[in-house]
């Protein structure tokens, strides 16, 4: 029986649920940015206050995840959560008696290479099955490849069909027990197939951009099941993609001329030095670029950042008050950031107190609980009254959202637990470091950070404008730090 099309509803795309080979592409990088793992608090901020000016997110397009019950022939039955397809139509007839079903989503072009596999559970009476890709307009009463804007590999003959009723010799026939893989390479616009893990070669060239996986059946009892990446593939598609990347890496890393190599090295040294200085690593920065290293207050900022990241808020505030006395007067965002961290500290202290009181006795009295909560509630009220005075809309939204922690006995297991994490405190330490840099007349972003941001944006722009080879790359994992 056809399953309810629940996976046709709009749902967040989870990076962990992507096939591994897609995680390493530009598509995977875009999914990661919209995934809570990228920066959990920024993800929640976007969902919490989507009306804030300038807060526009590019949601990645969904990838195929099942067969589409709303785009299939009536002669097909979908089963197993719309992953399986069974033909129960007439046993014989014309070419129009075939039955096809498309996937629930088109393949995003920035996947660079897309691949799926079909397992033949039963060849049925004649094994007249077709596997391939098609445009949205393909009729569902034909096998893939036998009609315009569709490409298919047929099991009963081993022929390939290129938008035509006439087939050409291509590969072996396939039958019950076989696993047929079908891939599209958007970089060179080709379609290829595999059989039982073996590569069969390029079948079609100059194919369209917007494609759907499609399966077609024609004889009674034919039964197949699809793997869109929810399970490991038989064919090593990860290796195939890495080989494509290696070709491009080789082109990009060809030995430059000696003069160009020297200029590159000087440029890289300056980038690294700027990053180290912004983060307070003065001595290391001198090693890379001794002539341009301006020490200024880098060591002091590093010490403050370390205190904040380690939860030593009082020490950090004392240091800031001593080293940057004007900052407290001139930077409301700095004051509010420190008060925000104080609030989170109070949330932790209050939780610890409630936990201690409830040990031994199963339930803490309401009166005792209120007594413990009162200082936190008072501080939260003061913070709520003042947070709108800050200039940073992100800081305002974070404070507003964090007030939800008050609703939970255990904030560490709540949906807002990321506020209590060491990663978030490191993030806030970085933001405060940026504020101190601005106060002392320096850019809050190092040259290296701006260069990397530019690289990521440039790669995205090239991908959107049809530079297909760039879609292979996930700048984050390929060139920075693997996740």
UniProtKB/Swiss-Prot annotation:
Cross-referenced PROSITE patterns: B302_SPRY (PS50188), CTLH (PS50897), LISH (PS50896)
Gene3D superfamilies given in the database record: 2.60.120.920
Residue span, CTLH domain: 297-354
Family affiliation: Belongs to the VID30/GID1 family.
Pfam families according to UniProt: CTLH (PF10607), LisH (PF08513), SPRY (PF00622)
Subunit structure: Identified in the GID/CTLH complex. In the absence of stress, the complex exists as an inactive anticipatory complex (GID(Ant)), composed of Gid1, the E3 ubiquitin-ligase Gid2, Gid5, Gid8, and the RING-like subunit Gid9, awaiting a substrate receptor to form the active E3 ligase complex. When cells are shifted to glucose-containing medium, the substrate receptor Gid4 is induced and becomes part of the complex, named GID(SR4). Additionally, Gid7 transforms the GID(SR4) E3 ligase core into a higher-order supramolecular assembly (Chelator-GID(SR4)).
GO biological process: cytoskeleton organization; negative regulation of gluconeogenesis; proteasome-mediated ubiquitin-dependent protein catabolic process
Taxonomic lineage from the root: Eukaryota, Fungi, Dikarya, Ascomycota, Taphrinomycotina
Location relative to the cell: Nucleus; Cytoplasm
CDD domains cross-referenced by the UniProt entry: SPRY_RanBP9_10
Domain of life: Eukaryota
Stated name of the protein: GID complex subunit 1
GO cellular component, one term: GID complex
Species of origin: Schizosaccharomyces pombe (strain 972 / ATCC 24843)
